[in-house]
UniProtKB/Swiss-Prot annotation:
PANTHER family: E3 UBIQUITIN-PROTEIN LIGASE NEDD4-LIKE (PTHR11254:SF443), HECT DOMAIN UBIQUITIN-PROTEIN LIGASE (PTHR11254). This is E3 ubiquitin-protein ligase NEDD4-like. The modification N-acetylalanine is found at residue 2. Changing residue 355 to L: Impaired ability to inhibit SCNN. Transmembrane segments: none annotated. Changing residue 942 to S: Abolishes activity. No effect on USP36 protein levels. SUPFAM superfamilies: C2 domain (Calcium/lipid-binding domain, CaLB), Hect, E3 ligase catalytic domain, WW domain. GO terms for cellular component: apical plasma membrane; cytoplasm; cytosol; extracellular exosome; Golgi apparatus; multivesicular body; nucleoplasm. Ubiquitously expressed, with highest levels in prostate, pancreas, and kidney. Expressed in melanocytes. One of its GO terms (biological process) is regulation of dendrite morphogenesis.
């Protein structure tokens, strides 16, 4: 059935009484669940109109399918004739599947009784709302939101009905902006006032908003205000006074930014703006009223004087007895945590700003301290989430992103980096003032960090709580108690794009980035984020559509043959490569070339001699599913270790691969995964993470023959070094020092157990007499605690200021050497059967790690520079350009898997891809044209070669490459 709208209307017929036409627009989906093996979905939406009481379906329509995305944009409108009192709309999101049944992605059930009515005189007749997708049953795995616009078409009954509808709508979370309101020209929605203390907003399983009063444990549909809860003022005053006293008790104020937003509890949809009063007098007016949104165009710009008067009228600033006198405007994220807090001395103009120009001047800011009278006007700062206070992210007419600093009315192309400095602890409340930290704008030339949180050590280290914490940490090294040297701070999830707490990145005069550790007051060239292995970093693969705008001065054009190229108007050059993919944060860290290591390695290889009276090769035939035990029996059965120096020849059962180097690299890779698996009890994770390994001191309890297995592992490590292969493992630094026979120092413990290190360092810098420590250690094994003397009769010798250095040395010796001495001796026994230990000692502990395990990070630029092409391919061939683009868009883990797919190992030689070895010596990575576009790529690991078919599109190449890397296993032919 069609109407004057020119669109079909579903549902009831026109002669039905009390019916209205509902316009429904399915706008988009947000962060839907992944159903595809490639991390995407093909979503569409089914709209079902049904009678609520009878569960009878009246109409069913469906949107189009959006391919390969988790954030689809449909923008499709439908019209329904409904009875608002007893009809409902069910929105179901599905992932289209051509082979099997479509996967369920979530649903939203919406009642129709409280929807707004359109006003034809308004510029924006109705607004959208994000609905949390709900599961259909407890087995459903859904996530994300569905963005909808729903409003009734106006009747001919006049304006009274509309006004009545609007008043009713405002009570249920929908907002209809009045056309006569001055804020109707704004692009932002007018936010509701904040909830009273003790109230919480939630959404039920039907998508309806309700409010919970935690003070008297009741719920209601109506949004409360401070006027509604005046009868409970005594409880509110007592509760907020307790919170204010708690804040004044704290030695300083912590301002931090969440590293990863979390979904809000109960499915709450993030609200726009709210006013939070920081330590204000409850007797005064503390209700934060909603501020007007910024103007939509230059024509509707509000003058600073008018905005100042409006803010002065709406914000009630009442000083309390302590002189803490202001309210801070913040933006509440889904995690409902404090992001930034700012009070400036001028009103920021919210008008439309021109595209970026050079930043001019520094933002003016003021510090409000106790006893000072603040200015009557408080700046309304429009802040984009994740940016410093007063900064906003916008896009120009060409889609390029720029940043607006409303504090000093400037624009810039560079994303601001917020530096949050925390003051030292202080015992008095008068020193716990709030300070404004100005954002610093830098142009990072390496891995950038949007946020740096500086954690200063606590003052007053001689306080009794600190001493107790040190003593507890020393008495029980496995104690989870936090270190007394770091100030309390929110526990964030590890996110690769952020530096660790207390670190900062700066640029040296020569353009090289360096890193400052404010915790230890040291600097280093090494990025602290790269201490995490690639499989522990959380940065996901990039989408070509999410790269953002081109850098300033760049232009994208289409060639006559349909290929995209890029013009740099700054240097007047053209290139095929996308400049956005050349960011060091995407390409990976540069390979730190070491000439000294190269010379040592060449000398080391010359001194290794192969005995003359051994067979031509050492053969092993193994099963993949039992590689550990079969390798152990085969290698330990060799009575003469020199036989292992013959050429390795590995065969996997039921595979036809010929080992010319590639199968052996695969064997070392798979065997490393098994040998170093803590499940077998030979190794364990260090105290601070779950990827760095150390010898398990209790390995004898797990395996009676554990020393024989350590000898086997030593032989495998010696085999790898002798034959130029790499192990896949991460060991603590003291492990390599023990191999070299070097003394382990206190600094070596910092990266292994930071809490234990901080405790020992405190003892070194202070008098430990009052701690009542003895020369003994409490060791816990399987729930039982044992006391171990560090020296004869150590439990009777007290640690004093005179003998504390001896105590620290004995603790380190016990922690790293004494407990695992037998295991390390067995490991070195097997290792030195193939390599003389004196020859190994020409390397230091860092170089020994690189010799045995190589580099864990992939520098794509270095990989690309040391690659060759055959059979019609060249560096500028479209398929080659697509291949490297696909590699750049991969996350670090997928690059490692690709490297393992084409070379047989997941590690890179010390000096990069220039030193890749094949079956007959150095062999650069090679890409050769082969096959037809219907086939998957194939690899020859012995020659470091990838056979790549001439695919017709980038999407096809990327899909086939990922499929080959993630699903291929086994050898056939020469490898």
């Amino acid at each position: 059935m069609a109407t004057g709208l020119g669109e079909p209307v579903y549902g009831l017929s026109e002669d039905e009484g009390e019916s209205r036409i509902l316009r429904v627009k399915v706008v988009s989906g947000i962060d839907l669940a992944k159903k595809d093996i490639f991390g995407a979905s093909d979503p569409y939406v089914k709209l079902s109109l049904y009678v609520a009481d009878e569960n009878r379906e009246l109409a069913l329509v469906q949107t189009k399918t959006i391919k390969k995305t988790l954030n689809p944009k449909w923008n499709e409108e439908f019209y329904f004739r409904v009875n608002p009192s007893n009809h409902r709309l069910l929105f179901e999101v599905f992932d289209e599947n051509r082979l099997t049944r479509d996967d369920f992605l979530g649903q939203v059930d919406v009642p129709l009784s409280h929807l707004p009515t359109e006003d034809p005189t308004m510029e924006r007749p109705y607004t959208f709302k994000d609905f949390l997708l709900r599961p259909r049953s407890h087995k459903s795995r859904v996530k994300g939101f569905l963005r909808l616009k729903m409003a009734y078409m106006p009747k001919n009954g006049g304006q009274d009905e509309e006004n009545s509808d609007q008043r009713d709508d405002m009570e249920h979370g929908w907002e209809v902006v009045d056309s006569n309101d001055s804020a109707s020209q704004h692009q932002e929605e007018l936010p509701p006032p904040p909830l009273p203390p003790g109230w919480e907003e939630k959404v039920d399983n039907l998508g309806r908003t309700y409010y919970v009063n935690h003070n008297n444990r009741t719920t209601q549909w109506h949004r409360p205000s401070l006027m509604d809860v005046s009868s409970e003022s005594d409880n509110n005053i007592r509760q907020i006074n307790q919170e204010a006293a708690h804040r004044r008790f704290r030695s300083r104020r912590h301002i931090s930014e969440d590293l990863e937003p979390e979904p809000s509890e109960g499915g709450d949809v993030p609200e726009p703006w709210e006013t939070i009063s920081e330590e204000v007098n409850i007797a005064g007016d503390s209700l934060g009223l909603a501020l007007p949104p910024p103007p939509a165009s230059p024509g509707s710009r509000t003058s600073p004087q008018e905005l100042s008067e409006e803010l002065s009228r709406r914000l009630q600033i009442t000083p309390d007895s302590n002189g803490e006198q202001f309210s801070s405007l913040i933006q509440r994220e889904p995690s409902s945590r404090l992001r930034s807090c700012s009070v400036t001395d001028a009103v920021a103009e919210q008008g439309h700003l021109p595209p970026p120009s050079a930043p001019a001047g520094r933002a003016r800011s003021s510090t409000v301290t106790g006893g000072e009278e603040p200015t009557p006007s408080v700046a309304y700062v429009h802040t984009t989430p994740g940016l410093p206070s007063g900064w906003e992210e916008r896009k120009d007419a060409k889609g390029r992103t720029y940043y607006v600093n409303h504090n000093n009315r400037t624009t810039t192309w560079t994303r601001p980096i917020m530096q949050l400095a925390e003051d030292g602890a202080s015992g008095s409340a008068t020193n716990s003032n709030n300070h404004l930290i100005e954002p610093q704008i830098r142009r990072p030339r390496s891995l950038s960090s949007p946020t740096v949180t500086l954690s200063a050590p606590l003052e007053g280290a001689k306080d009794s709580p600190v001493r107790r914490a040190v003593k507890d940490t020393l008495s029980n090294p496995q104690s989870p108690q936090p270190s007394p040297y770091n100030s309390p701070k929110p526990q964030h999830k590890v996110t690769q794009s952020f530096l660790p707490p207390g670190w900062e990145m700066r640029i040296a005069p020569n353009g090289r980035p360096f890193f400052i550790d404010h915790n230890t007051k040291t600097t280093t060239w090494e990025d602290p984020r790269l201490k995490f292995p690639v499989h522990m970093r959380s940065k996901t693969s990039l989408n070509p559509n999410d790269l953002g705008p081109l850098p300033p001065g760049w232009e994208e054009r289409i060639h006559l043959d349909g290929r995209t190229f890029y013009i740099d108007h700054n240097s007047k050059i053209t290139q095929w490569e996308d400049p956005r993919l050349q960011n060091p944060a995407i390409t990976g860290p540069a390979v730190p070339y070491s000439r000294e290591f190269k010379q040592k390695y060449d000398y080391f290889r010359k001194k290794l001699k192969k005995p003359a009276d051994i067979p031509n090769r050492f053969e092993m035939k193994l099963h993949r599913n039992n590689i550990f035990e079969e390798s152990y029996r085969r290698i330990m059965s060799v009575k003469r270790p020199d036989v292992l120096k013959a050429r390795l020849w590995i065969e996997f059962e039921s595979e036809k691969g010929l080992d010319y180097g590639g199968v052996a690299r695969e064997w070392f890779f798979l065997l490393s995964k098994e040998m170093f698996n803590p499940y077998y009890g030979l190794f364990e994770y260090s105290a601070t993470d779950n990827y760095t390994l150390q010898i398990n001191p209790n390995s004898g309890l797990c395996n009676e023959d554990h020393l024989s297995y350590f000898t086997f592992i030593g032989r495998v490590a010696g085999l790898a070094v002798f034959h130029g292969k790499l192990l896949d493992g991460f060991f603590i630094r003291p492990f390599y020092k023990m191999m070299l026979g070097k003394q382990i120092t206190l600094n070596d413990m910092e990266s292994v157990d930071s809490e234990y290190y901080n405790s020992l360092k405190w003892i070194l810098e202070n008098d430990p007499t009052e701690l009542d420590l003895m020369f003994c250690i409490d060791e816990e094994n399987f729930g039982q605690t044992y006391q171990v003397d560090l020296k004869p009769n150590g439990s009777e010798i007290m640690v004093t200021n005179e003998n504390k250095r001896e105590y620290i040395d004995l603790v380190i010796q016990w922690r790293f050497v004494n407990r695992v001495q037998k295991q390390m001796n067995a490991f070195l026994e097997g290792f030195t059967e193939l390599l003389p230990i004196d020859l190994i000692k020409i390397f230091d502990e860092n170089e020994l790690e690189l010799l045995m395990c190589g580099l864990g990070d992939v520098d794509v630029n270095d990989w690309r520079q040391h690659s060759i092409y055959k059979n019609g391919y060249c560096p500028n061939h479209p398929v080659i350009q697509w291949f490297w683009k696909a590699v750049l868009l991969m996350d670090a883990e997928k690059r490692i898997r690709l490297l393992q797919f084409v070379t047989g190992t997941s590690r890179v030689p010390m000096n990069g891809f220039a030193e890749l070895y094949g079956s007959n010596g150095p062999q650069l990575f090679t890409i050769e044209q082969w096959g037809s576009p219907e086939k998957l790529p194939r690899a020859h690991t012995c020659f470091n070669r990838l056979d790549l078919p001439p695919y017709e599109t980038f999407e096809d190449l990327r899909e086939k490459l990922l499929m080959a890397v993630e699903n291929a296993q086994g050898f056939e032919g020469v490898d």
